[in-house]
């Protein structure tokens, strides 16, 4: 089983990594093509393109300017440890064992607007470039056109390497839309995490994002390889709902969030 998750806007390059092992991103030639184009934009143009403040636009202009394809532990950090935010709070990679990192390296991928697809131990230099960014480029009108079927093809390779055709989608719609299903040789398993609010079970963004991270960690630590085993997920009060689920769309409900 291969999992995909979204990246995060929040990054941590201050905390020392809990593992010294690292790998190099596999598709840096594509990243470099984007970087060269982004370097042509002023900070104000970056702010407008990304719909962010002048401060964040300036920060990312500086990041694009200093980006170099020579990735080392001195200028980059393992992607799974660099990303922060709700999904990564749930995943809590800082407490994984070396054996867990080995398993994650085979069975987890992070979708990325700049890097396309990242493995957990791939070094990553800081950036912000969301997949939904309408950056016109030589390949089309936006990043979905830029990546085309490449991400699906790379996922096919990763699926083949780890031994089955099961793809567990724990990414947002914005990011999973970069996966072209017609080019994907996989059985896709989707998940929904709902919390009780005002008498109804609803998807609450903050909790759902964290739950995707919790599920990722569950799969890594339990070495899950059968979709039926996913139904055993009962972390932080969630339970599987057979009533609301369909064959490849698993729904988990929770009545009370932890304090």
Curated annotation (Swiss-Prot):
Q: NCBIfam families under this entry?
A: PRK02101.1-1, PRK02101.1-3
Residue spans making up a coiled coil are: none
- By its UniProt entry, which InterPro entries does this protein fall under? YaaA
Q: Which Pfam families match?
A: H2O2_YaaD
Species whose genome carries this gene = Pseudomonas fluorescens (strain ATCC BAA-477 / NRRL B-23932 / Pf-5)
Any single GO CC term annotated in Swiss-Prot or TrEMBL for this entry: cytosol
Family, per entry: Belongs to the UPF0246 family.
List the protein's name.
UPF0246 protein PFL_1025
Q: Which superkingdom does the taxonomy of this entry point to?
A: Bacteria
One GO term under biological process is:
response to hydroperoxide
Q: Which PANTHER family match?
A: PEROXIDE STRESS RESISTANCE PROTEIN YAAA (PTHR30283:SF4), PEROXIDE STRESS RESPONSE PROTEIN YAAA (PTHR30283)
């Amino acid at each position: 089983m291969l999992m995909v998750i979204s990246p995060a806007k929040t990054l941590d390059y201050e905390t020392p990594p809990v593992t010294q092992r690292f790998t190099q991103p596999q598709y840096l030639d594509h990243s470099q093509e984007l970087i060269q184009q982004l370097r042509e934009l002023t900070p104000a143009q970056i702010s407008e393109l990304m719909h962010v403040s002048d401060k964040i636009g300036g920060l990312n202009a500086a990041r694009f300017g200093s980006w170099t394809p020579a990735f080392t532990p001195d200028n980059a950090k393992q992607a799974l440890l660099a990303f922060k935010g709700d999904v990564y709070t749930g995943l809590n990679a800082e407490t994984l064992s070396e054996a867990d990192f080995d398993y994650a390296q085979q069975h987890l991928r992070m979708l990325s607007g700049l890097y396309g697809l990242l493995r957990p131990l791939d070094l990553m230099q800081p950036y912000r470039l969301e997949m939904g960014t309408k950056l016109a480029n030589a390949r089309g009108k936006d990043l979905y056109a830029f990546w085309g079927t490449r991400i699906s093809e790379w996922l096919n390779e990763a699926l083949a390497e780890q031994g089955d055709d099961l793809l567990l989608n724990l990414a947002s719609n914005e990011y999973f839309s970069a996966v072209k299903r017609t080019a994907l040789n996989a059985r896709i398993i989707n998940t929904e995490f709902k919390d009780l609010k005002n008498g109804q079970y609803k998807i609450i963004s903050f909790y759902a994002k964290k739950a995707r991270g919790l599920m990722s960690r569950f799969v890594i630590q339990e070495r899950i390889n059968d979709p039926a085993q996913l139904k055993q997920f009962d972390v932080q009060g969630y339970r599987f709902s057979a009533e609301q689920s369909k064959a490849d769309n698993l729904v988990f409900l929770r009545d009370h969030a932890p304090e």
